[in-house]
Amino acid sequence: MTDRDDRPGRDAEGKTSANPGRNHGLFTYLGKPKSNMTRRSASRRQFLGAVGAGALGGLAGCANPFESETTEGSGEELSVPSLAQFRGSGTLVEGRPAPGGTSIEDLPDLSGSLNIYMGGGEGGIYERFIEMLEEIYPEFTGFTDDAPSSSQAQSIVEAVQSGGSQADVFWSIDAASLGYVAENDAYEPLAAEALEPVPEDFQGADGSWVGVAGRARSVPYNTETIEESEIPEKVAEFPETAALQGTMGWAPTYGAFKSFVTAMRLQKGAETTRQWLESMRNAGTERYPNEYVVTQAVADGELTAGFANHYYAMRVKNQRPDAPLDLAFTSGDAGALVNVAGILQIEGTEKDALITDFVRHLLSAEAQEFFATVSYAYPMIPGVEPVGGLPTVDELNPPEIDLADLSDLEPTLELMSEAGVSG
């Protein structure tokens, strides 16, 4: 296996279709939403006009068909930004219908403060959304403490076990960290209203946490060197696929890759997983520092395919719209894992009502549209579509595992080391 850890690159961390060919789709990276607020008079249910595929202008430069609307709260008039201001910009956002789900304007006002342990934060995107909520609700403040999810999870557990945490909620980039806090009984169950919009597959046991944004494992591939039909639907077949010998890349040090291997271990067992890792290494799979660089190498033609979260291909396409890059998805195995960023209420907080309303805002139509079009995440509520022709969560076929079990990482690290693919 060739080691490419010294390559330069940016660190971006973070059911199959009835058609025999798997669903895939790419879309361009979306710009920062505008922060100015205007009054809304048009219906949130309107559709944006369709535009030609060659159009280059985003919503940010167009007349806004979704004017902002005011709500009454705490004796004051509050201004809710227009839907377009929650959206990113880009050609594939144009023509998107208004999302379904509950609008912010139909939710209780936020008032008070929350101490939020942010695990990850997707490059500041989550903080940006909190700032938008603070603009809507002058009486609300979200104080964030940003650190890696695993570190935050350990800090929360230690604080609760020693007498109490100063934080109210944990917003984690992955389910493994949420699962760790839940396993150690450092949480309080979320209210039913906060859980209701999200499918049970993306909730913790006993309502311990709820997903707010999803990401799917995928196989970015170079369309000039391989056909999608040549890519197996099971990762177990990759080591023996001739077209992929010596032409694939991965990033074993990356947290998302470790979760992928953990999912395989939980589903197939440690020995089968070790053998697969060794087979992929022996097949010449090249090592890279992160999955963004893997995806760049695929687009460059340096690799035929790789293993990466779905949104890295979207970021590459933003920079290089004509890059010969697309996505394939495996079926029913670890290669099809859908992980989530989610929210957990920390044991000992006395802000139950505010936390419930805060989580409901994260699952609002506007928030889910924001996460889908700005961070390219999979929406967690049925009424919002993923961007760019990606298969919906329902069309993907992830492995049947409890996402919280991804927190059991130590055995994964041991077998990766034994296989010569240390993280």
Model regions and ranges:
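Bacterial lipoprotein signal-peptidase II cleavage site
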Residues: 63-71
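Conserved C-terminal helix/tail region of periplasmic/extracytoplasmic solute-binding proteins
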Residues: 405-423
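Extracytoplasmic ligand-binding site segments that recognize negatively charged/polar headgroups
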Residues: 115, 119-127, 150, 165-302
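Extracytoplasmic/periplasmic substrate-binding proteins
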Residues: 272, 289-348, 385-387
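N-terminal export leaders
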Residues: 1, 42-61
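N-terminal secretory signal peptides
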Residues: 1-42
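Early extracytoplasmic/lumenal segment of secretory-pathway proteins
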Residues: 86-173, 179
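Mature extracytoplasmic/periplasmic domains
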Residues: 341-403
